[in-house]
Amino acid sequence: LPIYPIIFCEGDNDTFPLWYNQDTEEVRRDVRICNLSYAQTDWYIYQQQCPLYDAPGLPISWDQNQYQEGKNEYVAVRPELKKQIEALYQKHPEEARDSFGNDPYEIKNILKYWVFAEKQEFHVIPTDTINIYIDKDAVLRSGMMLPEAIRHLKGEELRDAIPDKLSISLKNIRLLTKVDLLMLEILANCNWERPLYMAISVGNSSKLKFD
């Protein structure tokens, strides 16, 4: 594995051997193991924010009061709000950007202006498609394997061929859990610098549509 990867796992049969390898055998202590079964709890999220052995903490920017027990356990997906939001951006674009950011469907803006808003009525996901913007320079620095169709390109031509954003569909999904939000937060903040892996134990319901 590359340096400082993050492994999402879910079952004891996967997690305990990984912990043993790090704790006892001192193998790959730069790898961060995140058990999604525990990631719904505030104490575990706090642990994951902190460095462990040679691995930095997970890129989670949340304050403790935003993930404490009983907060944001489930957040409703409300795509019907898109019409109102888009109407606001058409009629009052400056006010809309001040209220919800340049792209109201970017995950960072959804968390900031909706999920973690002071007003309880804003604690929803106002779309069925979430956007994560791609730092193209970071992608190229990472050395990751690019799609075969663009591998032959060079320079600006290659950079232009990389999509501007990653869109994740929430179609037919009515609720996101705290764990779902956590994974989206990590994906948005990794910036192609820390590779993400999922153990085979992670069920489809825990993957959103990452695969």
Language model features with spans:
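ER/secretory pathway lumenal C-terminal domains and tails of membrane proteins involved
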Residues: 1-4, 16-211
